[in-house]
Regions:
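PP2C/PPM-type serine/threonine phosphatase catalytic domain
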Residues: 1-254
């Protein structure tokens, strides 16, 4: 089974900087989207550090089997889940300490959502409110749950659609890289299935295209060319307002 993939990012229509970053590392079947936050330049620094640290960890573990991991693997997780988790934790540690050392970077952080693929499985890891969707059999499914204040409220209260739409703190996240010296990473593993397509994206996309069916229809319309699909998703989010940076990565199994 092979992979097709594409990624794109855009500053949007309201922001002065693009604090998003994405990574496509075909040698390791590694795909990442990060949405940075904090300070004048902090968000850009944090998201760039995250993709760099994750990329380097996968490179080092690919080329050196004897390398000492910065965190002990969790026996309950698959090797792919462990590699994603440790790479994110390592990035978090570096971001946290850099923010503590440099005053102008205090408070910086980033989300991260990532996919890694091996011979039989596809693993997903995430921190924050950047998402992973899967398109299978003509249906789109959100596989990740946002680490946000809204999701915390939904655990304990039955909110109506109107209450969710008008929730005042919808964009407040409860986890990010750089927030604390350690970070809890959510992971999951799925068997590979021919025809599956995975979308990694930040809130700049789904905040404008709020109906997942619109995301599905856009991808299906341009599915023969994933670069065009990624470009069109961003264009439609910009036409809806482009209030934030917009980043997407598409990964299809065929």
């Amino acid at each position: 089974m092979k992979l097709r993939f594409a990624g794109a990012t855009d500053i949007g229509r309201k922001r002065k900087q693009n604090q998003d970053r994405f990574l496509i590392q075909p040698e390791d079947n590694l795909f990442v989207v990060c949405d940075g936050m904090g300070g004048h330049l902090g968000g850009e620094v944090a998201s760039q550090m995250a993709v760099d640290d994750m990329a380097n960890f996968f490179i080092q573990t690919r080329t050196d089997d004897e390398i000492t991991w910065p965190y002990r693997p969790d026996k309950r997780l698959s090797i792919l889940e462990n590699k994603l988790t440790v790479s994110i934790k390592w990035a978090n540690w570096n971001i946290f300490h850099k923010a503590a050392e440099e005053v102008e970077l205090n408070g910086m952080g980033t989300t991260s959502v990532a996919i890694a693929v091996d011979e039989k499985h596809l693993a997903i890891a995430h921190v924050g409110d950047s998402r992973c969707y899967r398109i299978r059999g003509g249906e789109i499914t959100q596989l990740t749950t946002d680490h946000s204040l809204l999701e915390e409220y939904k655990k304990y209260s039955a909110l109506s659609e109107e209450e969710i739409a008008n929730f005042a703190y919808k964009n407040v996240i409860t986890r990010s890289l750089g927030m604390k010296v350690t970070v809890l990473v959510d992971t999951q593993t799925h068997p590979k299935k021919t025809g599956d397509l995975y979308l990694l994206c930040c809130d700049g996309l789904y905040g404008e295209l709020e109906d997942p069916q619109e995301i599905l229809h856009t991808i299906n319309e341009f599915r023969s060319n994933l670069d065009e699909a990624a470009t069109e998703l961003i264009a439609r989010a910009n036409r809806r307002g482009g209030r934030d940076n917009i980043t997407v990565v598409l990964v299809e199994l065929y």
